Swiss-Prot record:
Result when mutating residue 84 to Q: Rare variant; found in individuals suffering from stuttering; uncertain significance
Motif Tyrosine-based internalization motif mapped to chain: 488-491
Name of the protein in its database record: N-acetylglucosamine-1-phosphodiester alpha-N-acetylglucosaminidase
Modification note: The precursor is cleaved and activated in the trans-Golgi network by a furin endopeptidase.
Biological process annotations from GO: carbohydrate metabolic process; lysosome organization; protein glycosylation; protein modification process; protein targeting to lysosome; secretion of lysosomal enzymes
Residues forming coiled coils: none
Region (Mediates the interaction with AP4M1): 486-493
Protein purpose: Catalyzes the second step in the formation of the mannose 6-phosphate targeting signal on lysosomal enzyme oligosaccharides by removing GlcNAc residues from GlcNAc-alpha-P-mannose moieties, which are formed in the first step. Also hydrolyzes UDP-GlcNAc, a sugar donor for Golgi N-acetylglucosaminyltransferases.
Gene: NAGPA
Bilayer topology term: Single-pass type I membrane protein
Effect listed in the UniProt record for changing residue 51 to M: 65% of wild-type of activity
Intracellular or extracellular location(s): Golgi apparatus, Golgi stack membrane; Golgi apparatus, trans-Golgi network
């Protein structure tokens, strides 16, 4: 019995030990944040740079026009490389994404509101929530507080501001233009063509196809360059990440594994590598232990930070994340005037147009320059009417769309735009509707009466003509019977002697009855 009790006690102790190890294993999953690669001295409480804030004006930057849409083209290409840099083997990933306006996003740590909450999260956690196909760590942040540094615009939401401090920026404007370089606060806040995605890095690596590191060092931080720390940040080998675009306007993400001062690459080597990949503009993002690459929600890189158990390496909880996802509509809700289908807005209504369903189009005539195009059609100016506002108001009406009747004396017409009564147009006065109706009825009845009278007279004339003709024919027939044809036969005596009257008639006398 004692033996079984002892065995049970040992079993319980073993189980307790297993659970303790398991809990310890969970604790060991947290990064120690020990591979730090900072561009500026850690002891100095400062924002990303000490240089003067630029509130207004145009700063040096490059704008690349949005690439044309290529239906059916592959949206994402991820290449894995192992390259040698001065006899050092370096592994990493190069990602290209077409149509960055619809396939790329800057994400706050852990989702929307992460910067305001000063939240930190691993790239995996943030990427899974946003369905990222490829994700990397993004901009710089304060290790002790989690504060997002620099400018951050995430899906059109401005969540962090640098206040005009001049660090390298990469962003996408609403029309798809890719912007790389230095921006004033005024340019960041532009509302005519605002940024939909924007984040800050440190060091402009490549500008318009040329390495720009020296110029960037002088521009971004004069004072810290003297301390040597910024120079070390540029030249030390470490894990690195970058973002930019190529000549086709495709988004390019770069990631290289490493550990500060032990393995990896420096900024010069990274810039040269990117140039060989036809990258035109690129900036450097957070590196060192922050460098993380996640593919389809799974960690695909080798972190340099140690876990709580030094035997293992763990991904660091970082701030912003750059994400490549399936094509999305821009904006996702199509401005409330359409439905997003396969990354393209299908606009509702008859007049909403444009990639984001935010443009009103009332046809080629554009309301004939006499009205305003609205979501229900043309809203005509005063004095005009019709579906495209091409018709002037009829007499007696005025105002927008000719919806108001004139109120002039004697029903005179008014100005079709203002409704003012015009004395010079008295001759064009209109009759009252009742008078017009009575006149119309009278005219109608008069025409009907005249038509009936004309038909009656014609009928009587026809009857009279027929009667006269019948009477004439009847009289002719009677005369023919009374004075019909006959032959004259002279009378003779029975003895063959002529009558005495015939004898007495002279030979030259004319006999009217003789042929």
């Amino acid at each position: 019995m004692a033996t079984s009790t002892g065995r049970w006690l040992l079993l319980r102790l073993a189980l307790f030990g297993f659970l303790w190890e398991a809990s310890g294993g969970l604790d060991s999953g947290a990064s120690r944040d020990d591979d730090l690669l900072l561009p500026y001295p850690r002891a100095r409480a400062r924002l990303p740079r000490d240089c003067t804030r630029v509130r207004a004006g145009n700063r040096e930057h490059e704008s690349w026009p949005p690439p044309p849409a290529t239906p059916g083209a592959g949206g994402l290409a991820v290449r894995t490389f192992v390259s040698h840099f001065r006899d050092r083997a370096v592994a990493g990933h190069l990602t290209r994404a077409v149509e960055p306006l619809r396939t790329f996003s800057v994400l706050e740590p852990g989702g929307p509101g992460g910067c305001a909450a000063r939240r930190r999260a691993t790239v995996e956690e943030t990427a899974r929530a946003a369905d990222c196909r490829v994700a990397q760590n993004g901009g710089f942040f304060r290790m002790n507080s989690g504060e997002c540094l620099g400018n951050v615009v995430s899906d059109e939401r401005r969540v962090s501001s640098s206040g005009g401090l001049q660090n390298a920026q990469f962003g996408i404007r609403r029309d798809g233009t890719l912007v790389t370089g230095y921006l004033s606060e005024e340019e960041v806040l532009d509302t005519e063509n605002p940024f939909v995605q924007l984040l800050s890095g440190v060091v402009w690596l490549i500008r318009n196809g040329s390495i720009y590191i020296n110029e960037s060092q002088a521009t971004e931080c004069d004072e810290t360059q003297e301390t040597g720390s910024f120079s070390k940040f540029v030249n030390v080998i470490s894990a690195r990440t970058a973002i930019g675009h190529d000549r086709k306007g495709q988004l390019v993400l770069f990631h290289a594994d490493g550990q500060t001062e032990q393995r990896g690459i420096n900024l010069w080597e990274m810039a040269e590598f990117l140039l060989k990949q036809d990258v035109v503009n690129a900036i450097n993002l957070d590196g060192g232990g922050s460098a993380t690459f996640v593919l389809n929600g799974t960690l695909a890189s080798y972190p340099s930070d140690h876990c709580q158990d030094n035997m293992w390496r763990c991904p660091r909880q970082v701030s912003t994340v750059v994400c490549v996802h399936e094509p999305r509509c821009q904006p996702p809700d199509c401005h409330g005037h359409g439905t997003c289908v396969d990354g393209h807005c299908q606009c509702t209504g008859h007049f909403w147009r444009g990639p984001g369903c935010d443009e009103l189009d009332c046809g080629p005539s554009n309301c004939s320059q006499h009205g305003l195009c609205t979501e229900t059609g043309c809203r005509c100016d005063a004095g005009w009417t019709g579906s495209n506002c091409s018709e002037e108001c009829p007499l007696g009406w005025h105002g927008p769309g000719c919806q108001r009747p004139c109120k002039c004396e004697h029903h005179c017409p008014c100005d079709p735009k203002t409704g003012n009564c015009s004395v010079s147009r008295v001759k064009q006065c209109l009759q009252p509707p009742e008078a017009t109706l009575r006149a119309g009825e009278l005219s109608f009845f008069t025409r009907t009466a005249w038509l009936a009278l004309t038909l009656a007279l014609a009928f009587l004339l026809l009857i009279s003509t027929a009667a006269n003709l019948s009477l004439l024919l009847s009289r002719a027939e009677r005369n023919r019977r009374l004075h019909g044809d006959y032959a004259y036969h002279p009378l003779q005596e029975m003895n063959g002697e002529p009558l005495a009257a015939e004898k007495e008639q002279p030979g030259g006398a004319h006999n009217p009855f003789k042929d």
